[in-house]
């Protein structure tokens, strides 16, 4: 079984002393997020997110199924994550780790419980048929802050995804291929963004977007999920350290600035990809007309 290698005492002392002086190994300030890159695939709902050496891919798929009996007017949203040795040698293949469970629950709460995805719009026939939206998250490389990376990937993929158009006559549902009718975007009401803080010196020092080495040395962490409208969706704290309420408020203010910036990057990437796809679609249509 592959085990995680602990940081040496010299490296630990160097990193902690640097953080106390407001310095980080990659040159960032304590409240700086790494440069975010978002690339969409050829199909709707495929996205590749990376910052630093952390890289995550997400894919959205849908199928028509029966809604839950206690929610006959709602569709279904689910998320699956996959942590394998491909991303980090300490992860075990075929085994669901506690970290994987935490990530799945945090993202599921961020999307579904905050009503970011309008599940009522996924209803086709009440109590009989609805859309089941699945988000599959694959971690390609782990250099810290997997929660934030997974959240950004899922939100970007949901905003990018298009489902087939439907025609409903009575209880008969017809699914139109994308070649026949323009696919329909999901109803996304807002973009919840996870921002994770790592704490040192028993909670007195907080940093944003920790690298893997910084995560190994921290006393605990806290993830704040919020959107650009200053609405806090959830707060999750890992670790037994006590965090002063004033520190939480300070972190929330920092998280808001980061969330606004991340939403802007996501929207810009979406707009650019949409323009590319429209150009390809129009070019393909013109080619078909000439032939």
From Swiss-Prot:
Matches recorded under SUPFAM superfamilies: Ribonuclease PH domain 2-like, Ribosomal protein S5 domain 2-like
GO MF: 3'-5'-RNA exonuclease activity; mRNA 3'-UTR AU-rich region binding
Protein name: Exosome complex component rrp45
Pfam families: RNase_PH, RNase_PH_C
Similarity annotation: Belongs to the RNase PH family.
Cross-referenced InterPro entries: ExoRNase_PH_dom1 (IPR001247), ExoRNase_PH_dom2 (IPR015847), ExoRNase_PH_dom2_sf (IPR036345), Exosome_comp_Rrp42_subfam (IPR050590), PNPase/RNase_PH_dom_sf (IPR027408), Ribosomal_Su5_D2-typ_SF (IPR020568), Rrp45 (IPR033100)
Compartmental location: Cytoplasm; Nucleus, Nucleolus
Lineage of source species: Eukaryota, Fungi, Dikarya, Ascomycota, Taphrinomycotina
Assembly: Component of the RNA exosome complex. Specifically part of the catalytically inactive RNA exosome core complex (Exo-9) which may associate with the catalytic subunits rrp6 and dis3 in cytoplasmic- and nuclear-specific RNA exosome complex forms. Exo-9 is formed by a hexameric base ring of RNase PH domain-containing subunits and a cap ring consisting of csl4, rrp4 and rrp40.
Organism: Schizosaccharomyces pombe (strain 972 / ATCC 24843)
Keywords, sorted A to Z: Cytoplasm, Exosome, Nucleus, RNA-binding, rRNA processing
Gene Ontology annotations of biological process type: exonucleolytic trimming to generate mature 3'-end of 5.8S rRNA from tricistronic rRNA transcript (SSU-rRNA, 5.8S rRNA, LSU-rRNA); nonfunctional rRNA decay; nuclear mRNA surveillance; nuclear polyadenylation-dependent mRNA catabolic process; nuclear polyadenylation-dependent rRNA catabolic process; nuclear-transcribed mRNA catabolic process, 3'-5' exonucleolytic nonsense-mediated decay; nuclear-transcribed mRNA catabolic process, non-stop decay; rRNA catabolic process
Keyword Nucleus: yes
Function description: Non-catalytic component of the RNA exosome complex which has 3'->5' exoribonuclease activity and participates in a multitude of cellular RNA processing and degradation events. In the nucleus, the RNA exosome complex is involved in proper maturation of stable RNA species such as rRNA, snRNA and snoRNA, in the elimination of RNA processing by-products and non-coding 'pervasive' transcripts, such as antisense RNA species and cryptic unstable transcripts (CUTs), and of mRNAs with processing defects, thereby limiting or excluding their export to the cytoplasm.
GO cellular component: cytoplasmic exosome (RNase complex); cytosol; exosome (RNase complex); nuclear exosome (RNase complex); nucleolus; nucleus
Superkingdom, taxonomy of origin: Eukaryota
Main location class: cytoplasm
């Amino acid at each position: 079984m592959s085990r995680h290698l602990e940081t040496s005492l010299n490296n630990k002392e160097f990193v902690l002393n640097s953080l106390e002086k407001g310095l980080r190994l990659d040159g960032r300030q304590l409240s700086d997020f790494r440069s975010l890159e978002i690339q969409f695939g050829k199909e709707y709902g495929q996205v590749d997110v990376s910052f630093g050496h952390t890289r995550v891919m997400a894919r959205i798929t849908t199928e028509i199924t029966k809604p839950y009996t206690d929610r006959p007017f709602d569709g279904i949203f689910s998320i699956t994550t996959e942590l394998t040795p491909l991303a980090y040698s300490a992860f075990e293949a075929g085994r669901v780790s506690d970290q994987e469970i935490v990530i799945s629950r945090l993202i599921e709460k961020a999307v579904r419980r905050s009503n970011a995805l309008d599940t009522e719009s996924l209803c086709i026939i009440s109590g009989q048929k609805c859309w089941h939206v699945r988000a599959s998250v694959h971690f390609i490389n782990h250099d810290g802050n997997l929660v934030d990376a997974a959240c950004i990937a899922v939100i970007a993929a949901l905003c990018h995804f298009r489902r087939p158009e439907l025609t409903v006559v009575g209880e008969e549902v017809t699914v139109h291929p994308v070649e026949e009718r323009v696919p329909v975007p999901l109803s996304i009401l807002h973009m919840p963004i996870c921002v994770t803080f790592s704490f040192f010196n028993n909670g007195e020092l907080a940093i944003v977007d920790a690298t893997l080495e910084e995560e190994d040395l921290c006393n605990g962490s806290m993830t704040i999920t919020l959107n650009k409208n200053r609405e806090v969706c959830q707060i999750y704290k890992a670790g037994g350290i006590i965090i002063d309420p004033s520190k939480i408020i300070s972190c929330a203010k920092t998280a808001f600035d980061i969330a606004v910036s991340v939403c802007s990057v996501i929207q810009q990437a979406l707009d650019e990809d949409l323009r590319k796809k429209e150009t390809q679609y129009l070019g393909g249509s013109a080619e078909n007309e000439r032939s």
